[in-house]
């Protein structure tokens, strides 16, 4: 039996069913999950473990440390940058322990030689935005106050980067906006930059890339429309600031990001329907005085490096250069 077409039936494509109470039923059979890997092994790019964040919200995180930091009795005192990575899924699907995200974060930890903190967040429509943003900020507080041994021994609190893929890129962007007003409260954590990997943005008016890629088989506009309908606050449209950062000439907080000298890396694929809006957001940030590094790859669909490990090497090299340019 063939896979459902995203164009013909976006709900079937997403494996979700609307319920009368406003929730959705998710069929997660296409999203295999994996356990953390706490024991060092030459086969694992990173060791990892799961830790609770807020038990009342059932939020937690997966912490990754490069295997090189613990293999062969290595007790190096080298402090590593912290990459806070928010997973994708249109705010309605997926989880920290999904195999694709676990493998991606493990390789980020190894290739960037960084501690990766991948927090969970509450999903919509059961918890509409800004719930995910609240949880994303709370994860920063967790890092700041954590007594975890990996954090205490290896984390460089002065070099924190917010990163995310798709909805996670949107989340990293909005957590960054929120954080500009709480720099002193976050101390000793110091955010140095945002790494927005194929960030999930949208607007009411179709962009040229959305029109060109209307029949995209990965993440077409008809599918992202459903995701926004389920995740945005009730009664708003896609020109809300959560989905469309360019509305009203953007947030005034972007200028604060510029003054704080946080750098931003905007990563996109030319075959992603969202590419034009991603470029528009990058242009807006530059206008507001933010230093933006843009990395766009021809032929790449939405989330290409998550889906295809062979595409990660070039991406990780670019991100590594970006981080080194900030340190």
UniProtKB/Swiss-Prot annotation:
This is Carboxylesterase 20. One of its GO terms (biological process) is regulation of secondary shoot formation. Expressed in roots, stems, flowers and siliques. It comes from the Eukaryota. Keywords: Hydrolase, Serine esterase. GO terms for molecular function: 4-hydroxyphenylacetate decarboxylase activity; carboxylesterase activity. The keyword Hydrolase applies. Pfam families: Abhydrolase_3. Belongs to the 'GDXG' lipolytic enzyme family.
């Amino acid at each position: 039996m063939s896979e459902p077409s995203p164009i013909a039936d976006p709900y079937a494509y997403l494996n979700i069913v609307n319920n009368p109470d406003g929730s959705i039923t998710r069929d997660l059979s296409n999203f295999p999950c994996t356990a953390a890997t706490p024991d060092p092994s030459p086969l694992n790019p990173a060791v990892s473990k799961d830790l609770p964040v807020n038990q009342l919200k059932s939020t937690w995180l997966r912490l990754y440390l490069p295997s090189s930091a613990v293999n062969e009795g290595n007790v190096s005192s080298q402090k590593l940058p912290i990459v806070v990575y928010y997973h994708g899924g249109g705010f309605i699907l997926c989880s920290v322990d999904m195999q694709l995200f676990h493998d991606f974060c493990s390789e980020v930890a190894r290739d960037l030689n960084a501690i990766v903190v991948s927090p969970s967040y509450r999903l919509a429509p059961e918890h509409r935005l800004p719930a995910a943003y609240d949880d994303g900020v709370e994860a920063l507080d967790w890092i700041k106050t954590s007594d975890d041994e990996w954090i205490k021994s290896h984390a460089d609190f002065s070099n924190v980067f917010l990163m995310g893929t798709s909805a996670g890129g949107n989340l990293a962007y909005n957590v960054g906006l929120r954080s500009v007003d709480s720099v002193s409260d976050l101390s000793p954590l110091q955010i140095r930059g945002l790494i927005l990997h194929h960030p999930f943005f949208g607007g009411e008016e179709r962009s040229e890339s959305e029109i060109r890629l209307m029949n995209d088989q990965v993440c077409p506009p008809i599918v992202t429309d459903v995701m926004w309908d389920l995740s945005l606050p009730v009664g708003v449209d896609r020109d809300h600031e959560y989905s469309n950062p360019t509305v009203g000439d953007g947030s005034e907080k972007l200028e604060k990001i510029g003054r704080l000298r946080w750098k931003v890396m905007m990563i996109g694929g030319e075959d992603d329907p969202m590419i034009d809006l991603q470029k528009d957001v990058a242009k807006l940030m530059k206008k507001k005085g933010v230093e933006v590094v843009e990395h766009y790859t021809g032929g790449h669909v939405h989330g290409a490096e998550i889906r295809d490990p062979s595409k990660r090497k070039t991406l990780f090299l670019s991100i590594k250069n970006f981080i080194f340019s900030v340190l």
